[in-house]
Amino acid sequence: YVWDRNYSETRLPEVPSAILEMLSHQSFPDMRIAQDPLGKFYIARSIYKTILRFVNSNHGTRYVVQPLAPQNFSVTQNGGVALLSWSAQLDKTEPSARPTSYIIYKAEGQGGFDNGTIVNTTRCQMQLEPGKLYHFKVAAVNAGGESFTTETLSVLYNPAASKSVLIVNNFHRLASPQVVDDEEKQGFDFDQDPGVSYGLTAGWSGKQQVFDRSRMGNETSFGLGFSGNEMIGKFVAGNDFNYVQAHATSIAASGKYNISSCSSEVIASGRVQMQNYQAVDLINGLERHDGYTHAFFKSFTPELQNRIRQYASQGGRILISGSYNGSDMQTEEEQAFLSDILKLSYEPTGSTVIARDINPEDSTVTERDSIVCTSPNVKGLGLQFSYYNELNAQHYAATHPEILKPVGNYAFTAMQYDTGTSAAVAYKSTTYRSFVMGFPLECIIDESTRTSVLLGILKFLTD
């Protein structure tokens, strides 16, 4: 441990240094900021700006602040030519952070990213080699440095393909563990929602065990905020912003489709039209409106709902996977979207339903209460498989998969948890088709199984 060590860097004058008292661990509002990945970023960027201004002002030189990551990223292809498009994200508090150029990083197939190509505009065309899968990400640049990169997007030109798939990334969420803050309880509830870190993170000693506000100030194992130590030294995978790449790799294995991809932002704005594609693969991941994160995240924003409605009315074929496709849609209008367009209803885990047991000898029926639940094991499409459902260092976990039930004619359960509850709902009519999963497809542990599942769903949607 280093928390109780004698920090010579802050005592000896050889190296200029300082301890910044930004937040108090005894202030819950402060800790909400400290646990929020976006809060950590804002604090770090503020410190960076302060040091930059201090050093440059001492030397009488002009400073330029590093830009923010580009947004509204899309990579679409037409006839073997890829069009990359994005927009600058401006820092409203710092005029000098405006980007002057961009770096496009490219990877081919299973290879790593190159050292990047500098461009001066927010659009770029590239010739694609037939049959080769490409992955791209973009960073903004100015005299102050280079930004974080965008999410990773993928593109594939297959001359023999008659159908094109658009992969849409809607998993942008970053969040602390579930905030509990009422008259009786206070803290972070890992079991309710472990949150979403930015990439791989080792940030916790253990789960909070005591939430009783009446025990505030008690410095014992019974005091408010007391936590375990089971997570000391353990890394937890978060949002890597590269799940389009995983989906594209599976789709490319079929050799049957062209692939384009984009962020959900450009779908909502209409810059990329879903109706130009024979199928859409929407990645929702752990996206949801949690009610405590400062930034707004949502599985289906009103704008995205409208685009999906339009796509369905024009004969669209859409796959949607994620952990909160049902629970994140609670208003009357949102539930109408689920039932009218996606042909499903959400059943909370732990709900009590009436089960009917039939006696095979005399056919008598006995009714009993049964509690519905999910499991990490799923069967469907002729396969049995497992997905990441516990925190680990390899891949983000779907700790709260959902039960999605079919609604109306032509909708049916396409996957089941081994508890017998519905894990996915498929809908096939003469107008449009949909396939909605109660857990993220990219969380399927075995890669070959994940590919088989995704290609099986695309076959259902497009054949």
Model-derived features: positions:
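Pro/Thr/Ser/Gly-rich low-complexity, intrinsically disordered linker/stalk tracts
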Residues: 53-96, 130, 145-162
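A glycine-rich, often tryptophan-bearing local segment used as a flexible ligand/cofactor-contacting loop or short
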Residues: 286-393, 453
